[in-house]
Amino acid sequence: MAASCGHKSILEDNVDRRVEDLLSQMTLQEKIGQLNQVSLLDGFSEEVASQIADGKVGSILNEADPAIINYYQKAAVEKTRLGIPLLVCRDVIHGFNTMFPIPLGLAATFDPELVQQGARMAAEEATARGIRLTFSPMLDIARDPRWGRIAEGSGEDTYLNEVMGVAMVRGYQGDLDDTTCMASCVKHFVAYGAAEGGRDYNSTGVTERVLRNFYLPPFEACVKAGAMSLMTSFNDNDGIPSSANGFLLKDVLRDEWGFDGFVVTDWNATREMINHGYAVDNKHAGELSMNAGVDMDMVSCAYIDHLEELLAEGKVSMKQIDNAVRNVLRVKFRLGLFEHPYADVEKARTASYAPAVLEAARVSAVESTVLLDNDGILPLDKAKVKTVLVTGPMADSPYEQMGTWSMDGEGSRTVTPLKALKDLYGDDVRIIYEPGIESCLDKAGKGVGKALAAARKADVVLAFMGELAIMSGEAHSLAEITLKGDQRAFLEALYKTGTPVVLTVMAGRPLELGFELDHSDAILYSFHPGTMGGPALAQLIFGDETPSGKTPVSFPKSRGQIPVYYNHNMTGRPYRGETLLDEYQASGRQTSLGGTSVWLDSGLDPQFPFGHGLTYTTFEYSAPKLDQVEYGMDDTIIAEVMITNTGNRKATEVMQLYVRDLVGSVTRPVKELKGFKRITLEPGETKTVKFGLPVQNLAFYGQDMVKKVEPGDFHLWIAGNSASGVPVAFSVY
């Protein structure tokens, strides 16, 4: 019988009985072994195989060869006294072999059904190799593009992170009766994305109220959706390292949310509490983690080396150890590992790169690409454009195109823009390729002259620029979020040839693009689009596909605006569009009277707001209409709006619903995303679109730290981005 992974079902009673039966037979050493996760970064290890056979390892990570995985699994199943199988884990972040767009790009699709499909396909490829848990999705709210790991999540908005996170959990985990069910480990718990200065691993200082209103809801939603595992974060928040935060791991996660999966640390995070100055040594760190509610220790060896001694000293209890083992065993039983511990080596040879998976990756790359700006040059007309120069360091860089966390992706299977343009349009258009700059970090060389000469002879320049894959992701934060090397100088030189320039940016974060806007005729932002990014971009450029992506994070004008995000609180002196610095008189008299919360040299608005994205047509929205103006606590708000495609091309619009609570017991955001819909319209077509918003979705943690809806007045918008739309008023009583 099928059941959604992680949900209570008729199978759960049987799982619990099996857990208790097995637990009753285990020695202390066998129990501790289940809580120890080891890495295989250096390839096959006979030492690890011996440790497994001795019952000292419960989980492994960083191995993807099914034959090696089976060798280790055989040691666990056939050589240990109780035959408990290993849980094999890996970072399957945005695809396994077939790479989908990076998660930040997937968030730009605003298409949770597509994201769920991609996660399901990634699970099917990975489980064929014997991998049964992925450290994904990342649910960290990220408002600082300097932080490298912004690439791995769904951006700055809580609701979007909830929706996309749940889609990934459901996609990975599938059904309990299916051996392609791969457990989801949601991460990083919590506030890791709020690292000071955008510097990875740095401290955070997020208050409990802000945690509950912004950072925790995506985790709660994924726990309710059945996520089997959760990973603690590297950071300390308010002075407490996450792997020692009992309030979050026990009071919130277990007691409030009812989580019954297992908690694992991030890489070596237990031992790193020594570096934090929070633990004296690894033994002390293990004590802190166990007492806080961490079940599995990733590679620190704190549990395997010290738990027995800590138990003898009374610093941890047998009840704590038993509960941790229960949580691990429960997941192993739910996954069916005891019935199906081994990878199918023959199946693994043909499990990846199926046509349907490649097509889903292409569609995902299409939908994740955001048309930031267009002076009318796009889409290109094959009947008018005869010669195209393809240039830039990302035009034919298959590995870089895949993006961060592509360890199992294969550059040889990646279709680049250059290849796709030649394959799809080479019979109609002359394609000239001169890279100009070979790498995103390179300085200008002799190749630039060749590219400029070709640009002068072309009808259009297609410039592909951006970031290397390694420039985003873990441990890859930046102080300057601009195109690196001589890319800007090269772009300027291309633009000065007078030939129209279409710039496509592949990057793991939002970049500063003011210079690029001044030196291009259109900008497509595809983040890192994955294996099938080339065909997607080629089809978008020539109009066989239309852009529909929306920015999942605000794009700052400069690093000085960071953090800039749409759902900030209102200040006592809100921005009114007053005079900026470059309009001041040199002899102006010093005064602070009448000032507002604004940057004098750049205003308040970002370069591109959250939810922004153009297409090859235009849409017109009516003012929203509500079914009533007053609502009770148990009501659902019905809002409808008319939307018209006022252009001459069929296209898809992501309609976004925002709400503002005008007065609260604590200050509230100026807007909050509460819903969205993807709507496709023919040229000239008008549709009436309805949204249903339960009043209870307006609840928040106020001054009394209780989640509830506060009666009062609200505004509601339905628009194409977070910075537009006409508000309509309603009240809740």
Pin down the residues of each PLM region.
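Edge beta-strands of extracellular beta-sandwich domains
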Residues: 726-730
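Glycoside hydrolase catalytic-domain context in secreted enzymes
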Residues: 2-700, 708-722, 733
